């Protein structure tokens, strides 16, 4: 049976889509979404999707989200039985979302809220794991904006990006424990480490735990290595061998891999879906 990709469309109308990457067949699951869906995760065994929302722009076409109206919801893979898991002022701007199916946790970033969250996949036990700044006073400091997230359950780590200003060359990938250290708060964790720094503008993350490889998209300046797919290898707790695997993204965002077929798919703000071969490498192929 062909595998499906679940995609989010923001403009001109918010939609949740299902794409067959082998034949290009596209199906709309949900339409009419008004609050900018951004992150999506699949629980294949339960047949459910999880979606984060950025909320409403402060003014039309501003692409600024400085009000606490982000949301997190779940639904079936057919777009039915929609349930609100978090919202009502709890966070500001929902970004990348990942699901730990084995332990029933959701992890996501709150960009303008400058935080990293987790909650059970029924919405319970909501916790702020990282707080990089104070909302709203520091929300326009883009070096504090948390965007992409990935987890390494084997070693008990969470990773996230703080992308920095557009094309600014100040992006970072950071790491901390999956749980708060005893006696610590989200805004003063002693276990936070910067594992990659001075990146053009890192966005979303994908961690291959079996291979020990971190992948990420970057939409920084082309001349500095932006608009690219990147990787680095985890060796003895440190990331080495940073490589730019492919270029040509039009402001890259999401990525997801299928190690069984040796493929990765990526999306960008240009409305493209790209395929990359993890086995042979080579250029991106537009689907």
Annotate each language-model stretch with its function.
Residues 1-5, 34-47, 88-105, 134-156, ...:
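Beta-rich, blade/repeat-based domains predominating
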Residues 1-28:
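An edge-strand/N-cap motif at the start of beta-rich repeat modules
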Residues 5-8, 52-69, 161-172, 217-225:
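Short, conserved, GDST-rich strand-edge loop motifs in beta-rich repeat architectures
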Residues 10-12, 54-56, 111-112, 121, ...:
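Short loop/turn segments immediately following the C-termini of beta-strands
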Residues 15-17, 61-64, 70-73, 115-118, ...:
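A short loop-to-beta-strand structural motif that recurs across blades of beta-propeller domains
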Residues 30-32, 81-90, 127-141, 181-197, ...:
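Surface-exposed loop and turn segments in beta-propeller and other repeat-based domains
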Residues 119-123, 176-185, 231-237, 276-282:
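Short loop/turn segments immediately following beta-strands, especially the blade-tip
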Residues 267-287:
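Blade-level signature of beta-propeller repeat domains, shared across WD40, Kelch, NHL, RCC1
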């Amino acid at each position: 049976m062909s595998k499906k990709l679940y995609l989010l469309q923001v403009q001109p109308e918010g939609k949740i889509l299902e794409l067959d990457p082998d034949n290009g067949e596209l199906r709309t699951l949900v339409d009419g979404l008004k609050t900018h869906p951004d992150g999506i995760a699949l629980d294949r065994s339960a047949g459910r999707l999880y979606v984060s929302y950025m909320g409403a722009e402060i003014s039309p076409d501003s692409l600024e989200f400085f009000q606490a109206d982000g949301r997190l919801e779940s639904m079936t893979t057919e777009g039915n039985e929609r349930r609100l898991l978090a919202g009502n002022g709890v966070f500001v701007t929902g970004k990348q979302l990942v699901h730990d199916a084995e332990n029933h946790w959701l992890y996501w970033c709150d960009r303008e809220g400058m935080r990293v969250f987790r909650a059970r996949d029924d919405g319970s036990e909501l916790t702020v794991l990282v707080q990089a700044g104070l909302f709203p006073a520091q929300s326009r400091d883009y070096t504090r904006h948390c965007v992409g997230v990935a987890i390494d359950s084997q070693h008990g780590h969470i990773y996230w990006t703080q992308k920095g200003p557009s094309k600014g060359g100040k992006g970072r990938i950071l790491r901390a424990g999956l749980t708060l250290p005893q006696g610590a708060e989200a805004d003063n964790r002693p276990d936070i480490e910067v594992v990659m720094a001075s990146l053009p503008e890192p966005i979303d993350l994908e961690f291959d735990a079996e291979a020990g490889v971190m992948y990420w998209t970057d939409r920084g300046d082309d001349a500095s290595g932006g608009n690219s797919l990147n990787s680095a290898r985890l060796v003895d707790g440190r990331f080495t061998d940073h490589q730019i695997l492919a270029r040509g993204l039009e402001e890259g965002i999401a990525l997801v891999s299928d190690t069984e077929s040796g493929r990765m798919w990526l999306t960008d703000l240009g409305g493209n879906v790209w395929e990359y071969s993890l086995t042979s490498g080579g250029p991106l192929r537009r689907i």
